[in-house]
């Protein structure tokens, strides 16, 4: 390793925040930092000092020091460049270079330090990239949360309005001298009076409890007042109304059954002591009249070793990609070995891969505007008619080796015009009246089911049906890059391994 640790300390050598990039005890790092001020010679303008075992590269920051602890054979020029990047990171997270401010943002600084250095070597990143990586901002997550909060507020407002209506109906019945309606189904006898709003809420929450037959109600003559039976017809009507507006309502039992079913149908991943995760994400933008505006695909092989006896291994990579993908290995991986023999191994074969942590050993990137590279083409043809628009949408799988699962093609609809009239359709559809979208759902698209169409009619203009968005997931990667064999460095004996492949969408739009 080259870089052992990075720390912010006081002029007395007290550690405020420290990140070790090799295995090192707390006593050891505190001892190194405590010895640091005693080694400095204030009469000389040096930015580093050395001992018999390590080198300190440092930069004063008002009353503090930014210190890098490296091995003595490290490149001092690279260390100084890395030190400058560390020093620029700290003001990004701390308003003042003071001990209290550094301590308050210690975790933010540690996360940023990890983006700069991996396995003791500096990553090729700049300040803007570090900020982006540490924020992990997701626009889709913000939109989802905002929509969810809006739905919850609307549902609560509707519940309050319905409760007021029921309370008013009960008061009207009492004024007319008739018995107020009771509530049954919560015990051996009916419960009358009380807060109507509370009873409605309790009815929805307690749908998973076993129902007991209500006691027969005494006849009280004909009444025009609103009646609530043991089965909660008003509640059922209200829930049906929410469902018709696109809200998903399910009882606790149903939710549990769905969760259990998901667990049963989820394919188990048999993880060996050596496990590879191959993940690809695609970002694609097409024009509505044809033509690929941009397609970018990022892939990575993540290695996870759970048994330290398999730490010194090599991965045999089979690259059958013919699309011109750009490959890049981790800085600690022997690039010459990979180029010559398609083997992924550490530069120092005596070293071991980290245990119980995901390590990215190989990544690739593909960027193109070639239409033949589009994995799934979508054609949307809206044509104006006398009553609005007739929309025809077609899909076609261009990569026959792919199998796309859980495909959802989302088409925006004009607001305030009602539900679309569906003609012919391959698969299923969902109409979301709240979001004004039509979701075309296809469980599988593969070589046996590579094309399909959807036709519907709705009032609107052709521009109302764009952008069309697509989402899917696949267990086969787009770029045909696989790990075919894993062997140990000593003896070249084979090692059992498992692989998990995922190809998913980051953004897929037809504008």
Curated annotation (Swiss-Prot):
Residues 168-188 are annotated as: Disordered. The modification Phosphoserine is found at residues 223, 244, 493. GO terms for cellular component: COPI vesicle coat; COPI-coated vesicle; endoplasmic reticulum; Golgi apparatus; Golgi membrane. It is found in: Cytoplasm; Golgi apparatus membrane; Cytoplasmic vesicle, COPI-coated vesicle membrane. It comes from the Eukaryota. The modification N6-acetyllysine is found at residues 233, 241, 309, 351. Gene3D superfamilies: 3.30.450.60, Mu homology domain, subdomain B (2.60.40.1170). Coiled coil: none annotated. InterPro entries: AP2_Mu_C_sf (IPR036168), AP_mu_sigma_su (IPR022775), Coatomer_dsu (IPR027059), Longin-like_dom_sf (IPR011012), MHD (IPR028565). GO terms for biological process: adult locomotory behavior; cerebellar Purkinje cell layer maturation; endoplasmic reticulum to Golgi vesicle-mediated transport; establishment of localization in cell; Golgi localization; Golgi vesicle transport; pigmentation; protein transport. Residues 168-177 have a biased composition (Basic and acidic residues). Its main location: cytoplasm. Residues 271-511 form the MHD domain. Keywords: Acetylation, Cytoplasm, Cytoplasmic vesicle, ER-Golgi transport, Golgi apparatus, Membrane, Phosphoprotein, Protein transport, Transport. Pfam families: Adap_comp_sub, Clat_adaptor_s. It is a peripheral membrane protein. Belongs to the adaptor complexes medium subunit family. Delta-COP subfamily. Oligomeric complex that consists of at least the alpha, beta, beta', gamma, delta, epsilon and zeta subunits. The coatomer is a cytosolic protein complex that binds to dilysine motifs and reversibly associates with Golgi non-clathrin-coated vesicles, which further mediate biosynthetic protein transport from the ER, via the Golgi up to the trans Golgi network. Coatomer complex is required for budding from Golgi membranes, and is essential for the retrograde Golgi-to-ER transport of dilysine-tagged proteins. This is Coatomer subunit delta. It comes from Rattus norvegicus (Rat). The lineage of its organism: Eukaryota, Metazoa, Chordata, Craniata, Vertebrata. The gene is Arcn1.
């Amino acid at each position: 390793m080259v870089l052992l640790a990075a720390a912010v300390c006081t002029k007395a050598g007290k550690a405020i925040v420290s990140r070790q990039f090799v295995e090192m005890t707390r006593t050891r790092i505190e001892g190194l930092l405590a010895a640091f001020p005693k080694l400095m010679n204030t009469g000389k303008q040096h930015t580093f000092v050395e001992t018999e075992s390590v080198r300190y590269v440092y930069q004063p920051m008002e009353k503090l020091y930014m210190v890098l602890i490296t091995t003595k054979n490290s490149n001092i020029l690279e260390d100084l460049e890395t030190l400058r990047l560390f020093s620029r990171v700290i003001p990004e997270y701390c308003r003042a270079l003071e001990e209290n401010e550094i301590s308050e943002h210690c975790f933010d600084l540690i996360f940023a330090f990890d983006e700069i250095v991996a396995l003791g070597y500096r990553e090729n990143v700049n300040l803007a990239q570090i900020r982006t990586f540490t924020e992990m901002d997701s626009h889709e997550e913000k939109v989802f949360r905002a929509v969810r909060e809006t739905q919850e507020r609307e549902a609560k407002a509707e519940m309050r309005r319905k409760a007021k209506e029921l309370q008013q109906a009960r008061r009207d019945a009492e004024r007319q001298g008739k018995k107020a309606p009771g509530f049954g189904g919560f015990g051996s006898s009916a419960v009358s009076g009380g807060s109507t709003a509370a009873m409605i809420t309790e009815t929805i929450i307690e749908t998973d409890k076993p129902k007991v037959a209500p006691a027969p109600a005494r006849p009280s003559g004909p009444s025009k007042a609103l009646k609530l039976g043991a089965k909660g017809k008003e509640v059922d009507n209200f829930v049906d109304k929410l469902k018709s507006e696109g809200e998903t309502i399910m009882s606790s039992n149903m939710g549990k059954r769905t969760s259990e079913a998901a667990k049963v149908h989820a394919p188990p991943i048999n993880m060996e002591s050596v496990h590879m995760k191959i993940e690809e994400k695609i970002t694609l933008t097409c024009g509505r009249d044809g033509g690929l505006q941009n397609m970018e695909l990022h892939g990575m092989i993540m290695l996870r070793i759970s048994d330290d006896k398999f730490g010194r291994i090599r991965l045999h990579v089979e690259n059958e990609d013919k699309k011109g993908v750009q490959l890049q290995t981790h800085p600690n991986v022997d690039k010459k070995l990979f180029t010559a023999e398609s083997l992924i191994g550490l530069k120092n074969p005596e070293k071991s891969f980290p245990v119980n942590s995901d390590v990215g050993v190989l990544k690739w990137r593909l960027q193109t505007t070639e239409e033949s590279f589009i994995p799934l083409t979508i054609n949307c043809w809206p044509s104006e008619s006398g009553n609005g628009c007739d929309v025809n949408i077609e899909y076609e799988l261009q990569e026959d080796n792919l199998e796309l699962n859980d495909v959802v093609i989302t088409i925006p609809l004009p607001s305030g015009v009602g539900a679309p009239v569906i003609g012919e359709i391959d698969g299923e559809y969902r109409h979301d009246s709240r979001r004004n979208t039509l979701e075309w759902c296809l469980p599988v698209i593969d070589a046996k089911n590579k094309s399909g169409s959807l036709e519907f009619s709705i009032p609107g203009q052709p521009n109302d049906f764009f952008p069309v968005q697509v989402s899917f997931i696949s267990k086969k990667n787009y770029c045909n890059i696989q790990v075919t064999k894993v062997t140990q460095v000593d003896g070249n004996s084979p090692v059992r391994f498992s692989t998990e492949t995922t190809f998913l969408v980051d953004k897929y739009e037809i504008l």
